[in-house]
Structure formats: structure tokens, C-alpha cells
A protein has these predicted regions:
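A conserved ligand/cofactor-binding region detector
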Residues: 1-296
Length: 296
């Protein structure tokens, strides 16, 4: 799948656009929930212009760099105009990046997804099997719409008892096993596990694509290479890229690293949208504390 989501960096979110779960709205916490979300949105929207002014003061346009040239070094009118437009865009983006900490996790957003029928089928199965009501509803609505255009490809999409039951039983098991264990403090980013043969794997895979040798033989050859020889292969394979948009070829994906990341929700959403990775998230919590940007 290829998803695209409304950005908290470039779009000011409207007041009142947050989810109201039936379980909360039918409980004694309904008024408190609505009041809290409304107050967060009021704080967010009321500070957009003041925060933009703060950003302009802290990062003035005179030091703004466009194409390697500072604003106060520019003389061409067209260049100055482009720089002013780019500067104001960066001011707005930085201000909204800071203020997104006010947005509750219940903030609703727009997501567009491009995928083939099989990917949609699996996605809907996961959505319709989720513990959250709003996620299940999205899965059902997606199924209704896709059934109009690719009915034969999504007709088997249905809730999975395996997914729902596994989540339920694993949550109960984890609670029983770990509830008495105190949560240990840790750094925000921890390299939990890494591939000790990463260099060998990448170099062997890089050579594999351009040879007819079996991988096992190439691994033995690479193990006998000097560090300089292996680095030469890596440089030839990846070193000619001119920008981050030119992704390395697939051999680079044969090395694996496992990180445990403790972050605020906004930072996680940025991470969630990018990179080739397998993500295993935990539920949102304040067990580890919370972040407040110094600018706020």
C-alpha cells in the first residue's frame, strides 16, 4: 500500500474535528472528554499566529538560506520574492510542528491509499478485526466502497478471529505476567538488536545480483576480503547516489537492526509514514511521562 495523510506540519486543523467514541460518549466521562478536546483545539488555534511571530523572531529571515545563499546576500528581486515565500512556508511549518503537541490523539485526519486488490483485502481484514470501534468502522466502509469497483478482489475480506482473539489473549497474558513488574527507564532510542554479519550480508548480496555464484559461495568469498575491499564494493553500490530520493538497490535491505524508540505521538507519526521497516507499536501511554516543546 502507498498511503498519504493530511499533514500536521502544513495544514491548520479545524476546531471540533476529533473522534467521539460511543463508549466514551455513552459514559459519565462524555462531558469531560468533549471539554478537554475543545480546550486543546482552542489553545492550538489561538496560538498559530503568535507562534509564527515567535518563530520569525527566533529565526529571522536575514539568516534564511535558499540555494546556499543567505537572504541578506540577495539582490535580485525575483530571488528575494522566492526567498520570502520559502521563508514564510518554513515559518508556518515550524510553528505548526511545535503546536501539534496540543492536538489530541483523537484528532481526525484524511488518509488516501493506493494499493492493489490483494493489499486492500488484507488491510480490510486487519481493520475489521481491530479492537477499536472507529478502526472497524473504517474497514467496513472501505469494504462497501471497494465492492462497487473491484467486488471480485475484495469479496473474501472479513474479520479475522485469529487476529482479534490473539490480540485479546495476548493482552490478558501480558497483563497477568507483567503487571507487577516495574517499567524500567530507558533512553529514547535503544539499539535492541543488530545483525553481526550485516557487512557480509550486504556485500555478498550486492555481488550476487551481478554474478551467477550461489549466495553461500559469495559469503565465503566476502569473509576473506579485506575491510578495504568490502568498503570498495559498498562505495560502488551506494556511493554514486546524488540525493536521498535515489534509494540504494535491494542488497542494502539485507542488513537488519532492531530499535526500541520512545517518542511523542507526533514524532512517531512522522516515523510511521516513512522508510522500509516493520513496526510493532505499543498503546499510547503517559507511563513514561510526556513532552512539552520549550517553545511552548
Amino acid at each position: 500500500t502507498s498511503p498519504l495523510e493530511k499533514s500536521t506540519r502544513y495544514v491548520v486543523f479545524e476546531k471540533g474535528k476529533y473522534y467521539r467514541p460511543a463508549a466514551i460518549m455513552n459514559s459519565k466521562f462524555a462531558d469531560e472528554y468533549v471539554q478537554m478536546c475543545d480546550e486543546l483545539f482552542v489553545a492550538y488555534s489561538s496560538k498559530v499566529e503568535p507562534m509564527k511571530a515567535f518563530v520569525r523572531e527566533k529565526w529571522p529571515i536575514a539568516a534564511f538560506d535558499l540555494g546556499g545563499k543567505k537572504f541578506n546576500e540577495m539582490t535580485d528581486e525575483a530571488e528575494l520574492k522566492r526567498a520570502k515565500t520559502a521563508y514564510e512556508s518554513s515559518v508556518r511549518a515550524r510553528a505548526l510542528d511545535i503546536l501539534r503537541y496540543y492536538l489530541p490523539a483523537a484528532t481526525v485526519t484524511n488518509i488516501g491509499i493506493t494499493a492493489n486488490g490483494r493489499a486492500f483485502e488484507y488491510l480490510m481484514m486487519k481493520l475489521m478485526s481491530d479492537e477499536l470501534e472507529e478502526v472497524r468502522t473504517i474497514g467496513q466502509l472501505m469494504h462497501q466502497e471497494l465492492s462497487k469497483v473491484i467486488p471480485s478482489l475484495v469479496k473474501r475480506a472479513a474479520p479475522s478471529s485469529y487476529i482479534s482473539e490473539t490480540k485479546k489473549t495476548m493482552r490478558a497474558f501480558a497483563a497477568a505476567k507483567l503487571s507487577a513488574v516495574r517499567i524500567r527507564k530507558q533512553p529514547t532510542v535503544t539499539l535492541a538488536r543488530y545483525d553481526k554479519d550485516a557487512e557480509i550480508n550486504v556485500v555478498a548480496a550486492a555481488l550476487y545480483q551481478f554474478s551467477h555464484h550461489p549466495l553461500s559461495q559469495l559469503r565465503k568469498i566476502v569473509k576473506k576480503m579485506t575491510a578495504e575491499e568490502k568498503m570498495k564494493v559498498v562505495d560502488e553500490y551506494m556511493g554514486k547516489r546524488t540525493s536521498r530520493r535515489e534509494r540504494p538497490l535491494r542488497a542494502a535491505e539485507t542488513a537488519y537492526y532492531q530499535f526500541d524508540v520512545l517518542s511523542d505521538y507526533g514524532a512517531y507519526r512522522d516515523l510511521q509514514r516513512h522508510r522500509v521497516m516493520t513496526q510493532i507499536p505499543q498503546l499510547l501511554t503517559v507511563e513514561h511521562g510526556y513532552d512539552v516543546p520549550p517553545e511552548i
